[in-house]
């Protein structure tokens, strides 16, 4: 193509452990790898390059791995296997990603820009433009936990496009909101394209992807099914969707079940992750992290109920303590 590679996925796979209950998540931290629970491969051996200035669409049915790819691209989660190379600063636009519910819209803008390394003077200059673009009125001074999904998307999009990223990853952010805001977003995307920015566009809307993208990657149950020119791949995907929708419900359920069972099967070939050690937790790290989470939740319970620590423990059975100690898989069960 003659352009520099901006994003490279090399044999990338992402594995999640499947647990029967919440307490098993903590137990899994201390189990040997050979005794781990059943796994689910959200991505399996995915490889592609995205070049400087390209706009590439990611399409596929629910659970195909689109959002997993966008999260790995943006550094939200690491891959389990394979290598990811990102040449530039990435900004992920998805509904409520990185926004803090208790903070107001105004406070979230300031926090996000501070995290991008901006000085207070720079933030003050950008603030009016971001608020105007988001166009959420007086809600800018309200906690975003009270926002609708459309309002959160507006604010997230407005912040991200004003950070001037090299790579813009848009994950279903245009699926909410009215037509006026959608057109405003499309104009901004086209402006970014004219400036030679690299854009990854994740959407269920085939019309949006065809109109905005140069190439399309069609994900299907964690694997790449087709990749190529936008019109060609979009036509094949459209034909598949029409065919699938015509099938009886029993066949649809069987089809999806078979593919999900395939995603639970062990990876046949292992590709090393060069950065794996950066994400691996030692046994001591796991112990400290688990203890911190349990104590934090217990303390929060004490504050909420007004009980003493001794009184709480006397009323809490071992099973209840295990129920309290809930850890999210994405955050600490990474291998």
UniProtKB/Swiss-Prot annotation:
Gene Ontology CC annotation, any one: plasma membrane
Keyword annotations: ATP-binding, Cell membrane, Membrane, Nucleotide-binding, Translocase, Transport
Record carries keyword Signal: no
Top class in the EC scheme: translocase
Binding site residues for ATP: 60-67
GO-annotated molecular function: ABC-type teichoic acid transporter activity; ATP binding; ATP hydrolysis activity
Domain ABC transporter: from-to ranges: 26-246
Bilayer topology annotation: Peripheral membrane protein
Record-listed E.C. numbers: 7.5.2.4
Subcellular location: Cell membrane
InterPro entries: AAA+_ATPase (IPR003593), ABC_transporter-like_ATP-bd (IPR003439), ABC_transporter-like_CS (IPR017871), ABC_transpr_TagH-like (IPR015860), Bact_Polysacc_Export_ATP-bd (IPR050683), P-loop_NTPase (IPR027417)
Chief location category: membrane
Subunit structure: The complex is composed of two ATP-binding proteins (TagH) and two transmembrane proteins (TagG).
Family per record: Belongs to the ABC transporter superfamily. Teichoic acids exporter (TC 3.A.1.104.1) family.
Matches recorded under NCBIfam families: PRK13546.1 (NF010066)
Function: Part of the ABC transporter complex TagGH involved in teichoic acids export. Responsible for energy coupling to the transport system.
Name the record gives this protein: Teichoic acids export ATP-binding protein TagH
Organism of provenance: Listeria innocua serovar 6a (strain ATCC BAA-680 / CLIP 11262)
């Amino acid at each position: 193509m003659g352009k520099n590679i901006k994003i490279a996925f090399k044999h990338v796979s992402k594995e999640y452990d499947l647990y029967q209950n919440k307490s098993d998540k903590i137990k899994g931290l201390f189990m040997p790898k050979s005794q781990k629970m059943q796994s689910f491969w959200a991505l399996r051996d995915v490889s592609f390059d995205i070049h400087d200035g390209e706009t590439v669409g990611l399409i596929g049915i629910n659970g195909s791995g689109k959002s997993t790819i966008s999260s790995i691209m943006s550094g939200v989660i690491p891959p389990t296997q394979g290598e990811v190379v990102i040449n530039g600063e990435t900004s992920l636009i998805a509904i409520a990603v990185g926004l803090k519910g208790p903070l107001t819209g105004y406070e979230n803008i300031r926090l996000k820009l501070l995290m991008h390394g901006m000085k207070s003077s720079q933030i003050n200059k950008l603030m009016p433009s971001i608020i105007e673009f988001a166009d959420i009125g007086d809600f800018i001074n309200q906690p975003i936990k009270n926002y609708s999904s459309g309002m959160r998307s507006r604010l997230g999009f407005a912040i991200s496009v004003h950070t001037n990223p090299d790579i813009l990853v848009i994950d279903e952010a245009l699926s909410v909101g009215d037509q006026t805001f959608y057109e405003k977003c499309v104009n901004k995307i086209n402006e970014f394209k004219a400036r030679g920015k690299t854009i990854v566009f994740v959407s269920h809307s085939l019309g949006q992807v065809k109109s905005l993208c140069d190439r399309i990657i069609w994900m299907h149950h964690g694997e790449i099914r087709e990749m190529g020119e936008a019109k060609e791949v979009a036509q094949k995907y459209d034909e598949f969707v029409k065919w699938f929708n015509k099938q009886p419900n029993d066949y649809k359920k069987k089809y999806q079940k078979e593919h999900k069972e395939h995603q639970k099967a062990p990876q046949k070939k292992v590709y090393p992750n060069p950065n794996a050690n950066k994400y691996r937790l030692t046994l001591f790290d796991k112990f400290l992290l688990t203890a911190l989470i349990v104590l934090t939740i217990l303390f929060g319970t004490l504050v909420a109920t007004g009980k003493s620590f001794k009184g709480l423990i006397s009323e809490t059975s071992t099973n209840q303590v295990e129920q309290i100690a809930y850890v999210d898989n994405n955050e600490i069960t990474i291998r």
